[in-house]
Amino acid sequence: MNKSILHTIIIYTLASCPYCIKAKALLDKKNVIYEEIEVSNFTQEEKEAFIKKSGGKNTVPQIFIDNMHVGGCDDLFNLEQDGRLDKLLETQPKNKNSLTVSGA
């Protein structure tokens, strides 16, 4: 199977956040590749950029699919409940590998 990434999924998290764990579990259940960015070590500049990118939200998780801000955990589960998450992910390669990136 070709493992080229057709969608970019990024989830900003904190290790101890139960909502982050829940959101990642749903993405894992969907068997998709995502990039996890741990925000605990962000510099002030990185925090400000994260908040701006998240539409003023400073909570985690914040989830992006192809640079589109999906929102937080509840938003992700609402997409799932409405049947829209699968449509967003349908061409995403099936692979449980995830990548964890820490702030600078």
From Swiss-Prot:
Keyword Transport: yes
Record carries keyword Transit peptide: no
Annotated GO biological process: cell redox homeostasis; cellular response to oxidative stress
PROSITE patterns: GLUTAREDOXIN_1 (PS00195), GLUTAREDOXIN_2 (PS51354)
Residue ranges of domain Glutaredoxin in the record: 1-96
One annotated Gene Ontology cellular component of this protein: cytoplasm
Superkingdom, taxonomy of origin: Bacteria
Subcellular location: Cytoplasm
Disulphide linkage map: 17-20
SUPFAM superfamilies: Thioredoxin-like
GO molecular function, one term: glutathione disulfide oxidoreductase activity
InterPro entries the UniProt entry points to: GLR_AS, Glutaredoxin, Glutaredoxin_subgr, GRX_bact, Thioredoxin-like_sf
Keywords: Cytoplasm, Disulfide bond, Electron transport, Redox-active center, Transport
Subunit structure: Monomer.
Family: Belongs to the glutaredoxin family.
Known function: Has a glutathione-disulfide oxidoreductase activity in the presence of NADPH and glutathione reductase. Reduces low molecular weight disulfides and proteins.
Name of this protein: Glutaredoxin 1
Gene behind this protein: grxC1
